[in-house]
Curated annotation (Swiss-Prot):
Protein's name in the database: Histone-lysine N-methyltransferase KMT5B
PROSITE patterns linked to this entry: SAM_MT43_SUVAR420_2 (PS51570), SET (PS50280)
Domain of life: Eukaryota
Ranges of biased composition (kind: Polar residues): 19-32, 421-435, 677-690
């Protein structure tokens, strides 16, 4: 590729063409004036340059530079460089590289040189390639690569007959300058040079080109000291004499600092241009320069520099570099057959083209063959392995990450605070590991969870239960988009007593079960004849229990705090769609089971494992919520009558379900999400207390967000941290507190009877996020399949508080087979709670205390991101949650 100078030289020529005649006349006069001096000093061109600088009219010629910057005039530099490349590079590469002296004096500039000058130099402009010694010269280079003996190599290179004739007219200084120039090229082949020269046929402007490729790893700001550029300042006369547009003006650039044109030759002249270079030129003296790494360079990566904005036409519109090919700009913009230029990485956010992102695109191209990745992969042509090496190294690191993530997934239950590493094969999700990634960047995670099912969870539950499987109605939920699942499974301490005691699943116990067993034993709102021992049970096990007495009138209206702690908010079917009596029966048995469990679990029955999980967390809030044990009855249009009771009119249940909302009782963990469903039912004045049960191991979590894939509608579950305010019964009084969040779920009757709208407010103006505080949750219920299941439940005498919690194992959320059983319980139970919250349209001032969590973990498929929210304002938290 041409190195430096087309447009820059054109600029110089354009500046010169305006006064070409006058300049030429004056320059000829000055040349003739000093022809005598030049004849006396035929060996040096410094004297020749002196009058040109003194009398020239161009801006950079009036600077009176009496000493050439490199010790060589531009003419000598051209001559020495041509000979050195013919001796060193041409035999090694196998073709003739670019030469400055391609022909005799051009006719347009011959008039600038006097007879004496041209005669004295024996026509130095003429380059005569050395013939017949290519193999011998190549052997010299190969030997030098082994022994690195400069003097020996130089003697071998200049041992021919041609050298005697060449040095016949050279003085000692000129011979020394030529020798040093050859050494510069020989040092390219030293083992410690860190780079090599390779053929390059990429660019249309040259047929036999070369490129510089790194042979070792270079760090940012490293100087590649052996990649040297030799500088000679050009006068206007020398430009006319030496340069021919389109032929040898590839290494000319204009120095704005010195205000003059410069000829750059040497090994650095073979550095190609790139619009996103990895190196830049830095001066190492008056006559030399080297390159400095702008970023880390991998072995095999081509070393590139930036020639300028207008080197390849206006705005580099004819540039053929790799970056232009990847971006679809420059010469590739109008090329037929190429796809329209597309943003490399989410241009909406203006992400920079970093090496990691480019390598990520490279990996994406290997897997998905997208258009962007194709343009990236096309960068690896036959003569470069730069991008391949980068992609390979990146791939290795990603493999390590995947292995780590797998091991973390296995230990997630015991390590609640270990962030799950990215396990997705899609490289576009890598940015989600950044804690400051905007929410919109997380949307590409949407398709990841589209096919996750809970079937594995259901199978585990079935295996662990000895009772017959209860068929639940199918509740179709759009697969969640983002799910936070708990890290710690809650183990049952004792098997359940009674006819279905074996049904308790020890391995997959949800948090609501823990609540049930840890609640006040005296809470006899729904005290059944059966006294169930305090055990950790799942909703499935609760459903399977029999011998329960009829429960009092039930109304589903848990406080949003319950949903906050329990997991996903569980919207209840529209009041317009009154559930069938069978469905109501299902709900009643489970509710009764929950109440029983909560009532019969003594305070003393503390789970040591829960204590262990809490570790250093304060347990004082447990006591706080203990005193809050009043029943909670919520009137609402969506409430469900007690199963045994008659089927009430649509939307108006005859009874109310007392939903114990132990919000303070369970401590949320920023790492995982435990699910807690309402266990017993208390009055609205005092939420579920059971704080004394704090001794049990409770998973702490901050928030749970589920976005429905088809509509993009999010489900949000807010969970209060263990160390937040333990008394939830004062939520109304704290409604004005900015540290509280209120979630109001109401049915959207206008659009769909199954559509629920949740309004979030934090008691204070949430700022710009206040406009986006609506959540719409749509539940689709399969009434037909629920009927027989409900009957079966009723036969067993099991009362269920909410249909969604009953359907935990058979929801079409069973796409979540990849999630752990705990996480599945999370989604199902939280859905049930959301349903319950939908029922309480009049519960406007239930404020959920914002969690003072240190971190918030979002899990998308097998990818997770930990967000540090300790230093964020409450308003910022509400904005983030509202999104």
């Amino acid at each position: 590729m041409k190195w430096l100078g087309d447009s820059k030289n054109m600029v110089v020529n354009g500046r010169r063409n305006g006064s070409k005649l006058s300049n030429d006349h004056q320059q000829n006069q000055s040349k003739l004036q000093h022809a005598g001096k030049d004849a006396l000093k035929t060996g040096r061109n410094a004297v020749e340059r002196r009058p040109n600088r003194c009398h020239g009219n161009s801006g950079f010629e009036g600077q009176s530079r009496y000493v050439p910057s490199s010790g060589m005039s531009a003419k000598e530099l051209c001559e020495n460089d041509d000979l050195a490349t013919s001796l060193v590079l041409d035999p090694y590469l196998g073709f003739q590289t670019h030469k400055m002296n391609t022909s005799a004096f051009p006719s347009r500039s011959s008039r600038h040189i006097s007879k004496a000058d041209s005669f004295s130099h024996n026509n130095p402009m003429r380059f005569r390639p050395i013939k017949g010694r290519q193999e011998e010269l190549k052997e010299v280079i190969e030997r030098f690569k082994k022994d690195e003996h400069l003097e020996k190599a130089f003697k071998c290179l200049t041992s021919g007959e041609w050298a005697r004739h060449y040095f016949l007219n050279k003085n000692k200084m000129q011979e020394k300058l030529f020798k040093e120039h050859v050494f510069i090229y020989l040092r390219m082949f030293a083992t410690d040079s860190g780079f090599e020269i390779l053929p390059c046929n990429r660019y249309s402007s040259e047929q036999n080109g070369a490129k510089i490729v790194a042979t070792k790893e270079w760090k940012r700001n490293d100087k590649i000291e052996l990649l040297v550029g030799c500088i000679a300042e050009l006068s206007e006369i020398e430009e006319n004499m030496l340069l021919r547009h389109g032929e040898n003006d590839f290494s000319v650039m204009y120095s704005t600092r010195k205000n003059c044109a410069q000829l750059w030759l040497g090994p650095a002249a073979f550095i190609n241009h790139d619009c996103r270079p990895n190196c830049k030129f830095v001066s190492t003296g008056r006559d030399t320069a080297c390159v400095k790494a702008l970023r880390d360079i991998e072995p095999g990566e081509e070393i590139s520099c930036y020639y300028g904005d207008g080197f390849f036409g206006e705005n580099n519109e004819f540039c053929e570099c790799y970056t232009c090919e990847r971006r679809g700009t420059g010469a590739f913009k109008s090329r037929v057959g190429l796809p329209a230029p597309a943003p490399v990485i989410n241009s909406k956010y203006g992400l920079r083209e970093t090496d990691k992102r480019l390598n990520r695109l490279k990996k994406l191209g290997d897997s998905s063959k997208s258009s962007d990745s194709q343009s990236v992969s096309s960068n690896t042509d036959a003569d470069t392995t730069q991008e391949k090496d980068n992609a390979t190294s990146n791939r290795k690191s990603s493999v390590g990450v995947k292995k780590n993530s797998k091991s973390r997934a296995l230990t997630r239950q015991s390590m609640p605070r270990v962030p799950a590493a990215s396990n997705s094969t899609s490289p576009k999700l890598v940015h989600m590991n950044n804690s400051r990634v905007p929410k919109k960047l997380r949307k590409p995670a949407k398709p990841l969870l589209s096919k996750i099912k809970l079937r594995n969870h259901c199978k585990r539950l079935d295996q662990k239960s000895t009772s017959r499987k209860l068929e639940m109605g199918n509740l179709v939920l759009k697969e969640p988009k983002v799910v936070l699942y708990k890290n710690l499974p809650i183990k049952k301490e004792r098997e359940a007593e009674g006819p279905v005691h074996a049904a308790v699943g020890s391995g997959c116990l949800t948090r609501h079960a823990a609540r049930e067993h840890r609640q006040n034993p005296g809470r006899g709102a729904h005290s059944q004849g059966d006294s169930l021992p305090c055990t950790y049970t799942t909703r499935r096990s609760l459903r399977t229990r029999t011998g329960l007495k009829e429960t009092t009138d039930i109304k589903l209206a848990p406080s949003p705090l319950d949903g906050y702690k329990n997991g996903i908010l569980e919207p209840y079917p529209d009041s317009g769609q009154q559930p069938t009596p069978e469905v109501l029966e299902e709900l009643a048995p489970e509710t009764a089971l929950r109440e029983e469990a909560s009532q019969e679990c003594p305070k003393s029955d503390s789970c040591p494992s829960r204590k262990k999980f809490r570790q250093g967390k304060p347990v004082k809030h447990l006591a706080k919520t203990e005193d809050c044990s009043p029943e909670h009855s919520f009137p609402g249009k969506d409430g469900l009558p007690d199963l045994p009771g008659p089927h009430p009119d649509q939307g108006e249940p005859s009874g109310t379900v007392r939903v114990p909302v132990s919000y303070t009782d369970s401590a949320p963990s920023p790492v995982g999400c435990s699910i807690v469903t309402p266990d017993s039912f208390t009055t609205k004045d005092s939420f579920r207390t059971a704080q004394s049960k704090k001794k049990r191991r409770v998973t702490r979590y901050d928030a749970q967000l589920i976005l429905e894939n088809s509509s993009g509608i999010p489900k949000l579950t807010l969970r209060r941290r263990h160390d937040s305010s333990s008394k939830t019964n004062d939520h109304e009084s704290d409604s004005v507190n900015s540290s509280k969040i209120s979630i109001k779920l109401s049915k959207d009757h206008e659009s769909d009877s199954n559509l629920y709208v949740a309004k979030l407010s934090n008691g204070v103006s949430s700022g710009p996020g206040s406009s986006s505080t609506k959540l719409k949750i749509q539940l689709k219920r399969d009434e037909e399949s629920r009927g027989p299941c409900a009957e079966g439940l009723h036969e067993n005498g099991v009362c269920c508080s909410d249909p969604l919690s009953l359907l935990e194992s058979q929801m079409e959320v069973d796409d979540y087979s990849q999630y752990e059983e705990d996480s599945t319980d999370d989604s199902s139970s939280s859905e049930g709670e959301e349903e319950e919250e939908d029922c309480e349209d009049d519960f406007d001032d239930d404020f959920i205390p914002l969690p003072p969590a240190k971190r918030l973990r979002l899990i998308v498929g097998k990818d997770s991101i930990d967000i540090d929210i300790s230093s964020r304002r409450r308003e910022d938290q509400s904005l983030r949650l509202n999104a």
